[in-house]
Amino acid sequence: MSESEQLLEKQQDHKWDAATHADKGITIKTGKIAVSSSDIPLRNRKGLLTWDQLEPWQQDNQYIISGYRPPSFSFYLCVKSIFHVHNESVNIWTHLFGAIVFLFFIFKSELILKRDTTTAEDVYVITVFLFSAFTMLGCSTFYHTISNHSDDVSKFGNKLDYLGIVVMIVGSFIPCLHYAFACHANFRTLYIGTIIGIGVIVASTCLLDRFRQPEWRPYRALIFVLMGLFGIFPVIHALKIFSFSEILVRMGLVWLLLQGLFYIVGAVIYALRIPEKWSPGKYDVFGSSHQWFHVCVIIAAFCHFHGVCIAYDYFHERRGCGEM
């Protein structure tokens, strides 16, 4: 660690001590909310900041009253904070765990692609999904780790976080569309090309500064949900070609529906800011809406993973298009 980083760490420790020993009579006011800092458990405040002590660029959810890391202006200190408890801890560790799991399968894809009839196309489409999941979870982990660095770095990380979501949605579609329309190449190309085009448009929107503003929270959730709901069209199309029972395994449809359910539930919780909206200050470190959103995303990603594996197995059990 350089001398400048050591100095920054000492300055940060001083800020944390100041926050810890702040007058117990302080009252935090956020809109119509008024919460006394004496009501916030000391374990949640030690070395951390409260809402009213934040810089404007750090303020996003007024119902999260405490547990904020001070601006660090140091990537080293941001990474070091991973091993401390604060209101980003759950967000960081849930998606870090998921990123590690998907990275493992990227390098150990033979654990999934076990069929003798596996082709280069199988390797490609499944690797695309695994990489997209890793990208989304990795970008999310990165953003929540460095979100307290500085205004500019936080903005960059936030945009990267949203781009990761777009990559995940597009990457999730590709293996499902590949196996659903494996024997209908024109339809497969049409749907894959369409979702990639939609992804480019949404990604461009994510780069706009206004997209990350707190008032855009419900619109962000809606845009990503609508992007995912594009999947309704190829499913309806596939039902006109195949029986419902066949679609269940050809696309791993049950698991895709479960994935969609968890994504939608997570997005609704995220947009409505529940449960912290009902009891500001109670869910600052554990149990806030963003944390539940992260849990839903992890579960959804693994549901989709299982569905893709079912589609892969079914395709090779039927020996490709030979028996279709």
Swiss-Prot record:
- Provide the protein name: ADIPOR-like receptor SPBC12C2.09c
Its keywords, alphabetically, are:
Fatty acid metabolism, Lipid metabolism, Membrane, Receptor, Transmembrane, Transmembrane helix
Q: What residue ranges are annotated as transmembrane?
A: 92-112, 123-143, 163-183, 189-209, 222-242, 252-272, 292-312
Ribonucleoprotein in keyword set: no
Name the source organism: Schizosaccharomyces pombe (strain 972 / ATCC 24843) (Fission yeast)
* Gene Ontology BP term (one): intracellular zinc ion homeostasis
Q: Which GO terms describe its molecular function?
A: metal ion binding; signaling receptor activity
Organism placement in taxonomy: Eukaryota, Fungi, Dikarya, Ascomycota, Taphrinomycotina
Its domain of life? Eukaryota
What's one GO-annotated cellular component?
plasma membrane
Describe its membrane topology.
Answer: Multi-pass membrane protein
Q: Tell me, what does this protein do in biology?
A: Probable receptor, which may be involved in metabolic pathways that regulate lipid metabolism such as fatty acid oxidation.
* Compartments in which it is found: Membrane
Recorded family membership: Belongs to the ADIPOR family.
For the Extracellular compartment, the record's topological domain ranges are: 113-122, 184-188, 243-251, 313-324
User: Membrane side Cytoplasmic: which residues?
Assistant: 1-91, 144-162, 210-221, 273-291
Keyword Manganese carried by entry: no
